[in-house]
Amino acid sequence: MEALVYTFLLVGTLGIIFFAIFFREPPKITSNKK
């Protein structure tokens, strides 16, 4: 059961970070890099 909690925490943290980056910079990264 501990593994489930750790996985949930990891996914939650990654999701929050991804959301923060996505909202901070619009999806123009591919356009900017090319």
Swiss-Prot record:
Source species, domain of life: Eukaryota
Topology of this chain in the membrane: Single-pass membrane protein
Disulphide bridges: none
Protein name: Photosystem II reaction center protein T
UniProt KW Transmembrane keyword: yes
Subcellular location: Plastid, Chloroplast thylakoid membrane
Coiled-coil annotated spans: none
Function of the protein: Found at the monomer-monomer interface of the photosystem II (PS II) dimer, plays a role in assembly and dimerization of PSII. PSII is a light-driven water plastoquinone oxidoreductase, using light energy to abstract electrons from H(2)O, generating a proton gradient subsequently used for ATP formation.
Organism of origin: Klebsormidium bilatum (Filamentous green alga)
Subunit-structure text: PSII is composed of 1 copy each of membrane proteins PsbA, PsbB, PsbC, PsbD, PsbE, PsbF, PsbH, PsbI, PsbJ, PsbK, PsbL, PsbM, PsbT, PsbY, PsbZ, Psb30/Ycf12, at least 3 peripheral proteins of the oxygen-evolving complex and a large number of cofactors. It forms dimeric complexes.
Gene, per the UniProt record: psbT
Pfam families for the chain: PsbT
Keywords: Chloroplast, Membrane, Photosynthesis, Photosystem II, Plastid, Thylakoid, Transmembrane, Transmembrane helix
GO cellular component, one term: photosystem II reaction center
GO biological process: photosynthesis
InterPro entries documented for this protein: PSII_PsbT (IPR001743), PSII_PsbT_sf (IPR037268)
